[in-house]
Regions:
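S-adenosyl-L-methionine
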Residues: 1-24, 37, 41, 59-92
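Class I S-adenosyl-L-methionine
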Residues: 148-188
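Helix-to-beta-strand junctions that scaffold the AdoMet/dcAdoMet cofactor pocket
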Residues: 20, 43-44, 129-131
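Conserved SAM-binding loop of SAM-dependent methyltransferases across substrates and taxa
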Residues: 32-46
Length: 188
């Protein structure tokens, strides 16, 4: 059977190398709760996950997914923008932050992430990451603002101080139709 190479699965491989039981993690774009669930399973009973989304439907979907897997108590699921994540976690305390830019699968495509708030949230998240912590970014393009957001985020990542952050950007090189771009930032 041929293995699927989804962007989120690729990112999860890196996340699993960086998250330990007892860690604090953030899912900056909770969506349907897939990344939140992965993070909750990795932090164990002694860790915690804070998941953000601006859509009530995403909050309910995430809570339901976590409850179905018996890990809801490990997460704080917050109806708020990821630009406010510093109000919920201390600087230099977070092991991993995940972002999936774009719109909620199955949701309103008009409610999508935007370049300005996404870049602001990335910088907020970098302050929260502890040394050795990582940020996973799944950058989708297309839609009304996707190309603008993709280009702005990639430009911003390129400008991060190389003495403080290692930025790895990959791409599905031979796939048509603007496939998503996985990126990782490790705080040095």
């Amino acid at each position: 059977m041929m293995k699927k190479y989804q962007i989120t699965e690729w990112c999860h491989k890196f996340i699993k190398d960086h998250v330990q039981p007892g860690d604090c993690c953030i899912d900056a774009t909770a969506g349907n709760g897939n990344d939140t669930l992965v993070l909750c399973s990795l932090v164990g009973e002694t860790g915690s996950v804070i998941a953000f989304d601006v859509q009530e439907m995403a909050i309910q979907n995430t809570k339901k997914r976590l409850e179905e897997h018996g890990v809801l108590e490990r997460a704080k699921v917050v109806l708020d923008s990821h630009i406010h994540m510093a109000e919920y976690a201390e600087e230099n305390s977070v092991s991993c932050i995940t972002f999936n830019f774009g719109y909620l699968p199955g949701g309103d495509h008009n409610l999508a992430t935007r370049k300005e708030s996404s870049i602001e949230a990335i910088h907020e998240g970098l302050r929260l990451l502890k040394k050795g912590g990582m940020m996973s970014l799944c950058i989708y393009s297309g839609g009304d603002s996707g190309f603008e957001e993709r280009d702005a985020v990639l430009k911003e990542l390129k400008q991060l101080d190389g003495r403080k952050y290692l930025v790895i950007v990959s791409e599905y090189y031979n796939r048509p139709n603007n496939p998503p771009i996985p990126a990782m930032i490790i705080k040095l």
